[in-house]
UniProtKB/Swiss-Prot annotation:
GO terms for biological process: mitochondrial electron transport, ubiquinol to cytochrome c. It comes from the Eukaryota. InterPro entries: Cyt_b/b6_N, Cytb/b6-like_sf, Di-haem_cyt_TM. It is found in: Mitochondrion inner membrane. PROSITE patterns: CYTB_NTER. This is Cytochrome b. Keywords: Electron transport, Heme, Iron, Membrane, Metal-binding, Mitochondrion, Mitochondrion inner membrane, Respiratory chain, Transmembrane, Transmembrane helix, Transport, Ubiquinone. Binds 2 heme b groups non-covalently. Belongs to the cytochrome b family. The gene is mt-cyb.
């Protein structure tokens, strides 16, 4: 939960300073890293937090495989749907 909360907060702070215009997108990222107080830290926390979040998800899936939780079909299918939703959300956030 803490990892997801930090992703939401850092993403919100980054979105406050980011512009998606094709001419100024790179400049806004440079502005975040150079001019915003601790902008470089917020950007790194957001990027590395996403990787850590997926590592935690994969460890959780591995634990479920190890203990045979895939035998509970309904629960396992809900987990697969949640994994796909998280992956789609991360892709949309990346693009």
């Amino acid at each position: 939960g803490l990892c997801l909360a930090s992703q939401l907060l850092t993403g919100l702070f980054l979105a406050m300073h980011y512009t998606s215009d094709i001419a100024t997108a790179f400049s806004s990222v440079a502005h975040i890293c150079r001019d915003v107080n601790y902008g470089w830290l917020i950007r790194n926390m957001h990027a590395n937090g996403a990787s850590f979040f997926f590592i935690c998800i994969y460890l959780h899936i591995g634990r479920g495989l190890y203990y045979g939780s895939y035998l509970y079909k309904e629960t396992w299918n809900i987990g697969v749907v949640l994994l796909l939703l998280v992956m789609m959300t991360a892709f949309v956030g990346y693009v």
